[in-house]
Amino acid sequence: MLQVIFEDEYLLVVWKPVGIESQSSRGFGADMVSEVRKHIFKTSKKQGEPYVGVIHRLDKPVSGVMVYAKDKKTAGALSLQVTERKMQKKYLAVLCGRPESNEETFVDYLKKDEAGNVSGIVARGTEGAKRAELICRVVGFRTDPVWGELTLAEIELKTGRHHQIRVQMAGHGLPLWGDGKYNPMFGGSAMQMPESASTLAQNGKNEETNRRRGGQPQIAL
């Protein structure tokens, strides 16, 4: 069932669970656009197939807040905010390892391999490469008996590139826990998050809730 966070006549803010595509799926699996379209069709008085504008994306293994536009004008306005970097995108990630400092800015150049659906860090000036920037802020640490040092980090994207967080953090020696595509510790197998990592993530969620409680309503992407 679609979890709606906010809705008005112009846009819809929803929660995307892990394992669901954020845009229309090429296969038979569930995707958020189809779920949003069904929701609008059921609740709207307008006739015909509802318009759903994709403003930003989240990778399939990632959960988080998604914003969808209900008309082309709103989609254009929101997309412009993304282009002009007026829309903040923040994520919580469990990293394998420990950053050298509590806040670091990483700037790299990424190139996508369309055939393999992967991206990698390449030298500046490489044909087809795009500049990628993010800020990594440490929220907390845990030492797991199996996985070693784990870090809960808040990642703020300054650009939006293919698999950006996963690629950049892995490239800087801090791959995401459980990432079967870019973390060599996992090799593509889905595994249950260790208790220490779950505790880290839960503490991060609680901190975010406390930080926002009592202030103006905010939507963290």
Language model: regions and residue ranges:
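RNA pseudouridine synthases
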Residues: 1-221
